[in-house]
Amino acid sequence: CLKTLSVFLAAFAAADARAVFKTQGHKNSEMIPDNYIVVMKDGVSQDDFKAHVSSVASIHSTNKAKRGTNTEGMKREFDIMNWRGYHGHFDRDTLEEILNDSKVDYVEQDQVVRISGLVTQRGAPSWGLGRVSHRQAGSRDYVFDDSAGRGVTIYGVDTGIDINHQDFRGRARWGTNTADRDNADRHGHGTHTASTFAGTAYGIAKNANIVAVKVLSSDGSGSTSGIIAGINYCVQDAQQRGILGKAAMNLSLGGGFSQANNDAVTRAQNAGIFVAVAAGNDNRDARNYSPASAPAVCTVASSTINDSKSSFSNWGPVVDIYAPGSDIIAARPGGGSTTMSGTSMASPHVAGMGAYMIGLGADPRSLCDRLKQLATPAIRNPGSSTTNRLLYNG
């Protein structure tokens, strides 16, 4: 049980173990038993990393044979611009060996991550595009430069995307799947967010390219390790295609605080991918959520058509900007459209705006600050210690 695990790990700390076991999440976090994310220290070479992984695999195999456990061992490796680590299913003896390796920086327990909430209201009007292109509320016209993100790629890290939907006009492609064996968006969340950031009819960056990165299953849930694997894919894909500096990423998802999740999105942002993330939908301080609490990324809260904070939206000093998130209409899998609400809907407005601005020459690394400068100070009751600035395309 988690209580026993906490005592067990406290014993490690008392023994002055070289690596730190990071406590993360909040009281409602859903931990995945015996699953761990291991992060190596900066400067550990590729050769040393491979040697460590091989050693851990051997230790796990020995311990499994000795004790007859059903642990699976090493599951996946990460390398995001030399930020190296892995995810595995290990027994306590193997975990102790990992924590005592001087090359390991920290270990944290894997946890469940979910889409950042949604409410569906069929037939509600669409208003977000008009709002982010006017200083005053009320316009239904979306005014934008016709470049509209041309030459920029947006990675949708979500439940998958219906890449054949008519709203994408052939600009969407499949990337990878770290969630399950079904490369379809059975939920609809990922298709909706992609349509918001780059749909022809419903999107901000109407000419941007779209990549489907499935990290959440049909019930809208996944794991921190799966999210990191998806981010790892995005950075490596952008690097291989030579589009670092011409790419954005949207993560309309979240879980309890995770240093590994925050470190992964920070590496992606620093590599030259503009990262927009949902603040979360619990009407709580976003500092307790990841990746929303990562300082390097653009954390987005949700606003209503009346320029008020959406009742569900998280808030706090880590929020960078507000964007429309209540009653947003966009594409659904199989054709047509539907309406959803959530910070999940606000974040892709910012991801799309990021791609739009990158297409006009903006640097992804400083883009969140630029968006905050352009934003309209319009939000009523934004929340304690929270910005009142609403996304605007300048």
From Swiss-Prot:
A Gene Ontology MF term for this entry? serine-type endopeptidase activity
Q: Which residues form the Peptidase S8 domain?
A: 126-394
Active-site residues annotated for this sequence: D158 (charge relay system), H189 (charge relay system), S344 (charge relay system)
Q: What is the lineage of its organism?
A: Eukaryota, Fungi, Dikarya, Ascomycota, Pezizomycotina
Q: Which family does it belong to?
A: Belongs to the peptidase S8 family.
Domain Inhibitor I9, by residue range, is 36-115
What does this chain do?
Secreted subtilisin-like serine protease with keratinolytic activity that contributes to pathogenicity.
Q: Which residues form the signal peptide?
A: 1-17
Report the Pfam families cross-referenced here: Inhibitor_I9 (PF05922), Peptidase_S8 (PF00082)
Q: Which cellular components does GO assign to this protein?
A: extracellular region
SUPFAM superfamilies xref list: Protease propeptides/inhibitors (SSF54897), Subtilisin-like (SSF52743)
- Keyword Phosphoprotein assigned to the entry: answer is no
| Residue positions the entry lists as glycosylated | N100, N250, N306
Propeptide stretch(es), residue numbers: 18-116
The alphabetized UniProt keywords are: Glycoprotein, Hydrolase, Protease, Secreted, Serine protease, Signal, Virulence, Zymogen
Please list the GO biological process terms of this entry: proteolysis
Q: What's this protein's name?
A: Subtilisin-like protease 4
Q: What is its EC number?
A: 3.4.21.-
Domain of life (superkingdom): Eukaryota
Localization, UniProt: Secreted
Task: State the organism of origin.
Answer: Trichophyton equinum
